[in-house]
Amino acid sequence: MNVKAIAKQMPITPRKTRLVADLIRGKNIKEAQAILMFTPKSASPIVLKLLKSAIANATNNFSLDDKNLYVKEIFVNEGLRLTRLFPRAKG
């Protein structure tokens, strides 16, 4: 059974987040949590929060035991960009 958790519009670049996501792909849940806790990257708390959300979804919504869970798939896509306007004379 596949359990899903989604995080949208995170305030960090996808390139930095992909580095952390590659570390836990295919790992056991406990091993992935340990890796994320001790990784000194700025994206690791965001990915750890998302992983905990996926674990909570599995245990509460689907009544699955968290000892048998692993990270099957994790991917990072680019979100919306902030458009900034600088009001000044342009000519």
From Swiss-Prot:
Disulphide bridges, residue numbers: none
Presence of the UniProt keyword Transport in the record: no
Subunit structure comment from the entry: Part of the 50S ribosomal subunit.
Function of the protein: This protein binds specifically to 23S rRNA; its binding is stimulated by other ribosomal proteins, e.g. L4, L17, and L20. It is important during the early stages of 50S assembly. It makes multiple contacts with different domains of the 23S rRNA in the assembled 50S subunit and ribosome.
InterPro entries noted in UniProt: Ribosomal_uL22, Ribosomal_uL22_bac/chlpt-type, Ribosomal_uL22_bac/org-type, Ribosomal_uL22_sf
Domain of life assignment: Bacteria
Protein name from the UniProt record: Large ribosomal subunit protein uL22
Keywords, comma-separated and alphabetical: Ribonucleoprotein, Ribosomal protein, RNA-binding, rRNA-binding
Molecular-function GO terms, alphabetical: rRNA binding; structural constituent of ribosome
Pfam family, one: Ribosomal_L22
Family: Belongs to the universal ribosomal protein uL22 family.
GO biological process, one term: translation
A GO cellular component annotation in the UniProt record: cytosolic large ribosomal subunit
